[in-house]
Amino acid sequence: MFVDFHTHVFHPRIAEKAKMKLAEHYRLFCRCKGTPEDLLLRAGRAGIDHCVALCAATSALQVRPCNAYACYLQNNYPRITAFGSLHPDCADWKKELDKLRASGVRGIKLHPDFQHFRLDDKRLFPMFEEAQKDFIFLIHIGDSLPPEENPSCPYKMAAILDAFPRLNVIAAHLGGFRQWKYALDALAGRDVWMDTSSCMKEIPGDVLRAILKKHPRERLVFGTDYPIMDPQDEIDALQRRTRFSDAEVDEILGNGTHLLFG
């Protein structure tokens, strides 16, 4: 089974608005519609069997509706595994975890840059402690600011791994979007998963080769960042930039199966 481990889908009422926010922040054009139906159509064309849809609440007030949508996706789209969201300002985060568990949601997405908190916020620690038993975390890492100024960075992620060695976590964007040289220093080779989303257009070739040499291929999962990228385009870009063989690309596409389903 081939898995796209990094996608975003939105309710039709807000899909265009959500895409506009993505486009404004990253100064790019979202190629796809951003709906579950469009995601699954494009994934199928690319030979992808299953997708992980990530939800991230931009404020504490958005945690409940965000997780309600994750539960809806989980229970209405058999080819989608949904990840819910937490926020350090949310006082009822334990209840939210219970709701996610009851609906079969076993993943949490954190995006400090969009959610307006820092990844080194100690209020996250009780959440990691409680959820590490039965949840996978996918955490956005990196942006254009220097690591010490950016809400997320590879060094903050490394500190979390030190504090929670049993945490099952995916460091998005090969460990640090636009901070790949720091990801090479702080995360590559560690006991952490990385996804390949939103990397192939920007990552310098020498840094990409160094990360792939240092980080085991069996700890990489494929991701498109849909609706920003089309799945087939991203598969092609992955193979072109990495120069992996068909079998090696298939291995990365299949790694998400082991992570999701054992």
Question: Where do the PLM segments sit?
Answer:
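Conserved, mostly hydrophobic/aromatic
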Residues: 6, 43, 70, 100, ...
